[in-house]
Amino acid sequence: MKTGTIVKVSGPLVVAEGMRDANMFDVVRVSDKHLIGEIIEMHGDKASIQVYEETSGLGPGEEVVSLGMPMSVELGPGLISTIYDGIQRPLEKMYDISGTNITKGVEVSSLDRTTKWEFKPKKSVGDKVVAGDIIGGVQETAVVECKIMVPYGVKGTIKEIYSGEFTVEDTVCVITDEKGNDIPVTMMQKWPVRKERPYREKKTPDSLLVTGQRVIDTFFPITKGGVAAIPGPFGSGKTVTQHQLAKWADADIVVYIGCGERGNEMTDVLLEFPELKDPRTGESLMQRTVLIANTSDMPVAAREASIYTGITIAEYFRDMGYSVALMADSTSRWAEALREMSGRLEEMPGEEGYPAYLGSRLAQFYERAGKVNCLGMDEREGTLTAIGAVSPPGGDTSEPVSQATLRIVKVFWGLDASLAYKRHFPAINWLTSYSLYQEKVDVWADKNVNDNFSAQRAQAMKLLQVESELQEIVQLVGVDSLSDGDRLILEVTRSIREDFLHQNSFHEVDTYTSLHKQYRMMGLILKFYKSAQDAIKQNVTINDIIKLSVLEKIGRAKYVEEGDIDAAYDSIEDEIDNELADLIKKRGAEEL
């Protein structure tokens, strides 16, 4: 262990001398309180340390000890449904030790050392294995099997493998490597958080991550293994959108990072998720979720660690072959922590005081997402989808964090304050948002949902763009100056906005919409548009069309339960035909 002495304390930054033998990113223990820190800069024998706990009471002359290893997380059975702080300390255990206010220097194992897990081997003695091969599994929850993998850098033949109940530190397998050395394998691995976990090959993401949110799945989709940003001003619904994605996305594992946001938002997750049922498995959502809470009142430096901790845990499950979704709320708070540390290190500031390396740090985080061929001899694919909220002051997306994020991500869900104030949620602006995965998803949706899915989406998007042009004319000269055809477009796009894009996250049916239901809903609106166009050509007036009772039924169609969709929607389609046919007959009789 390398020992030094504190010479300066500046908030979360501590400078210690006598640290010549230490390394960059080594974990250190600061003072006799054993505060956790990490070396982030070296000058000769002086080390600058960012401390992940409250530094009040520290002073020059106190001891600093380098542990000689980087900041790492423990990976193994016991991660699912646990809530951690930013440096992977389980908050429930910390509460048992120190109560509601976390005391300094608390040391708690990330994974419980006493819990015994039922290990079932999947390999036999004499089998040849390489790094990443699955040697066995532990049924951690009803929906997640924690697959035990050969650690990175290990290759050889299985000499012994056991079955039964073990703790995470017990040896479950012994592998003889090519030099004849026996290597014991436990169910737990340690991995440095700043280092990307290896894989065999990165692939192009091409299948849709179904979120159940209509504006996302139909108009601005994200793939499994994609990256997305949700920028928006305060109160526009970033956190609720993140919660909706965490609840209903068809990922196998969800890692939710609350980075510098309100504590109440993490409380909502803890209260809601155990009560909600996953639409695919019927089990509690908590049984597939890992939570990392680093709320706004916790030490600023730990915000940076929380992002890396979360994505390393997500990569671990990706390596098992799972589809993982990671929510980071919010990356702006992480960037603010970088700015604070950069200022205390007296580095040259970049734009708006953020450090010059802001863009590269964001890229390092988002580039760890993707679809990969995992390590190991068997062919298995894993995906890691990263969705980051951005909180630009005043909703101004020209600020550095938003701009650096938009250069990296391929999906932009721009939240709009004016929509939020109109109570239109999700408040995703359909004119400014975009998805660069659209072409890949169109191919996937046409194959897996309906071969007309992408054509319907394109037609609806075109109508919404035409509406924005017509709105300018309406504001100048009024709606009566428009032709019946243009007024029909305004009526149909109102239906798309209010009946399709608007979604109530607190309604038990409307909160989640399957792809089939989304296709049928949009089909209803576009069928009405086509049939009404034909009626207008036969001299039916727009005033008669907008009084039809079927419009209300189209509006209420989103509350039809999944099992009744086809029968209910077929009935509404018949009503559209019948009511418009009656209008045409009536108009024909009047003309006679």
Curated annotation (Swiss-Prot):
Pfam families in the record: ATP-synt_ab, ATP-synt_ab_N, ATP-synt_ab_Xtn, ATP-synt_VA_C
Domain of life from the UniProt record: Bacteria
Signal sequence, renumbered to the chain: none
GO cellular component, one term: proton-transporting ATP synthase complex
Name of the gene encoding the protein in the UniProt record: atpA
Record-stated family: Belongs to the ATPase alpha/beta chains family.
Purpose of the protein: Produces ATP from ADP in the presence of a proton gradient across the membrane. The V-type alpha chain is a catalytic subunit.
Organism in which the protein naturally occurs: Clostridioides difficile (strain 630) (Peptoclostridium difficile)
Enzyme class name: translocase
InterPro entries: AAA+_ATPase (IPR003593), ATP-synt_VA_C (IPR055190), ATP-synth_a_Xtn (IPR031686), ATP_synth_asu-like_sf (IPR023366), ATPase_a/bsu_AS (IPR020003), ATPase_F1/V1/A1_a/bsu_N (IPR004100), ATPase_F1/V1/A1_a/bsu_N_sf (IPR036121), ATPase_F1/V1/A1_a/bsu_nucl-bd (IPR000194)
One Gene Ontology term of the molecular function aspect: proton-transporting ATP synthase activity, rotational mechanism
Binding site for ATP: 232-239
EC number(s) per entry: 7.1.2.2
SMART domains linked: AAA (SM00382)
Name the UniProt record assigns to this protein: V-type ATP synthase alpha chain
Record keywords, A-Z: ATP synthesis, ATP-binding, Hydrogen ion transport, Ion transport, Nucleotide-binding, Translocase, Transport
Catalytic activity: ATP + H2O + 4 H(+)(in) = ADP + phosphate + 5 H(+)(out)
Membrane spanning residue stretches: none
